[in-house]
Regions:
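Boundary at the C-terminal end of the N-terminal hydrophobic targeting segment
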Residues: 2-4
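Short helix-initiation/N-cap motifs at beta->coil->alpha
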Residues: 9-11, 67-76, 195-204
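A short, structured surface patch at a secondary-structure boundary
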Residues: 22, 28-77
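Basic- and aromatic-lined ligand-binding clefts that recognize polyanionic substrates
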Residues: 22-34, 135-189, 193
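Short secondary-structure boundary segments
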Residues: 27, 90, 218-222
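Proline-aspartate-enriched helix->loop->beta-strand connector
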Residues: 75-77, 82-88, 105, 207, ...
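Extracytoplasmic ligand-binding site segments that recognize negatively charged/polar headgroups
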Residues: 95, 109-125, 159-180, 222-226
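Structured C-terminal subdomain patch of bacterial secreted/periplasmic proteins
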Residues: 214-283
């Protein structure tokens, strides 16, 4: 059965003559896309931690080999797997693109700086490249229906802010980010980019200016800046604080993962949060 697929990726025209059997992916969102059509990559840049991958994504994948971190995947580990396709992130892996091409054909797609709509486009491209175009279209249709279901259970137009909190830094995820655009697609009112920054680092005063009805926080560290802000008198001026509408969410699911399953988990989480139900702990 002759297979040839040609798509436009971030580098230009990309063609494969035969269906890839040994795929290595260098971002978590690409693993999510493959899981959506039950194709298992042999290698994933999973930051040496399989738990970075959502449980519902892991359920669709056979065991894989870690090829190191997303920021600096190991070229040796990738080469050792003898892949016939590498899927890389156009922002993170531009510097190693040439080196990766020495190992196998490289499909270069947006991941790190993508929006929700771009992520779904990437998933469609990946589906086509692995010979599962029909299956991916069906999964994307199902995805749209599921997302509409969850959207219908949320109060339309509610102002919601999601951000990640480290020791010294809070980053607001605006409409231009993946998570922000997922929340916006659910009919929620998400802050716009600030001074051209899609993920600005903001202080408590700036958060007060945004003043969301709901504040959703992924704490990257135990001692996170938001926990300190909560001791500040200004904190009580936040609508979300007054209404007790501040919730903690899982950082892997909400900030690192990205993808079809990840968006569905975020939508399900958001419905639970807005209805004051406990979230399932991600194992």
């Amino acid at each position: 059965h002759a297979f040839a697929a040609t798509v436009q990726d971030e580098h230009g025209t990309f063609t494969l003559e035969k269906t890839p059997q040994r795929i290595v992916v260098l971002e978590l969102s690409f693993a999510d896309a493959l899981a959506a059509v039950d194709v298992s990559p042999i290698g994933i840049a999973d930051d040496n931690d399989a738990k970075r991958i959502l449980p519902e994504v892991r359920a669709h994948l056979k065991p894989w080999q870690s090829v190191g971190t997303r920021a600096q995947p190991s070229l040796e580990a990738i080469a050792a797997l003898k892949p016939d396709l590498i899927i890389a992130d156009s922002s993170r892996h531009a510097g190693v693109y040439i080196a990766l091409q020495q190992i196998a054909p490289v499909l270069l797609l947006k991941s790190r700086n993508e929006t929700y709509a771009e992520n779904l486009q990437s998933a469609a491209i990946i589906g086509e490249m692995v010979g599962k175009k029909r299956e991916m279209q069906a999964r994307l249709e199902q995805h749209k229906e599921r997302m509409a279901q969850w959207a219908s259970q949320l109060p339309k137009g509610t102002r919601v802010a999601f951000g990640t909190s480290r020791e010294q830094q809070f980053n607001l995820h605006t409409q231009e980010t993946w998570t922000g655009s997922v929340l916006a697609s659910l009919g929620l009112n998400v802050p716009a980019a600030m001074a051209g920054a899609s993920m600005p680092s903001i202080g408590l005063e700036q958060l007060l200016a945004v003043n969301p009805a709901w504040l959703l926080v992924a704490h990257y560290r135990e001692e996170s800046i938001v926990k300190r802000w909560q001791q500040d008198p200004l904190w009580q001026m936040l609508t979300a604080a007054q209404k007790q509408q501040v919730a903690s969410v899982d950082s892997n699911t909400w900030a690192r993962m990205r993808g079809i399953f990840a968006a569905e988990r975020i939508a399900a989480d958001t419905v639970k949060i807005f209805h004051h139900q406990p979230l399932t702990v991600v194992k």
